[in-house]
Structures are given as C-alpha cells and as structure tokens.
C-alpha cells in the first residue's frame, strides 16, 4: 500500500480513495488514522480479488443501481456492497486476517 496525500485528488465529502496499490488521502493527519487506513486496506483486498478494472466496473454498475433504488447519492454510495463491507469492518483491525474470499458478496 502506497499512501499519497493530496487535497486535490479526493472528491468533496471524502477523506480517502483507493486505486490499487495507491491510497490517496486528503489530509496528512489521516496517515495515522488506523480505522480509515483499514477501510482502504479492505478496498485494496477487494480490488486484488476482482482485479482492478472489473472492480471499478462492478462498483460503477452497483452505484448506478443503488442510485436508482435509493434516489440519493449518499445512500447509494453507502449501500454499495464494497462500501458496506468496508464500513462494517473498518474498526476491526484484524478483519483482513480472517476475511473470506469475495466476502463483499454477502453484502449484496
């Protein structure tokens, strides 16, 4: 995991973004935020399992589906299976050691 800090690469309303093998953070102080970094590490694992391009295709398709379903961009984002897995487990710093392959499917 390579961390890059840049205010200009992160969309408004977000603190981090992962594009394997990089984690982009908006604020330098977040390099010490274990919960945020664990959230992004979960996304790295998801991207490794699916390969990067299929991950983002699935992500975009599921976001579009959730946007139609919820009619709210924030609700759509929070209900993407990848995000649900990451948010549900970000505080468990041992989660990735026990995580099953394609675990995000349980969040569909």
Task: Show the residue positions of the predicted features.
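Metalloprotease/metallohydrolase-associated module, dominated by Zn2+-dependent proteases
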Residues: 2-15, 51-108
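Active-site scaffold of zinc-dependent metalloenzymes
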Residues: 4-30, 34
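Short alpha-helix carrying the canonical HExxH Zn2+-binding catalytic motif
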Residues: 33-46
């Amino acid at each position: 995991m390579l961390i890059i800090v840049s205010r200009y690469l992160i969309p408004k309303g977000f603190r981090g973004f992962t594009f394997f093998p990089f984690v982009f953070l908006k604020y330098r102080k977040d390099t010490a935020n274990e919960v945020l970094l664990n959230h992004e590490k979960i996304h790295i694992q998801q991207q490794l399992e699916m390969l990067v391009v299929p991950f983002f295709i699935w992500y975009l398709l599921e976001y579009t589906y959730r946007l139609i379903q919820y009619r709210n961009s924030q609700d759509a984002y929070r209900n993407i299976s990848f995000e649900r897995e990451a948010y549900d487990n970000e505080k468990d710093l041992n989660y990735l050691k026990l995580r099953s392959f394609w675990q995000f499917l349980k969040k569909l």
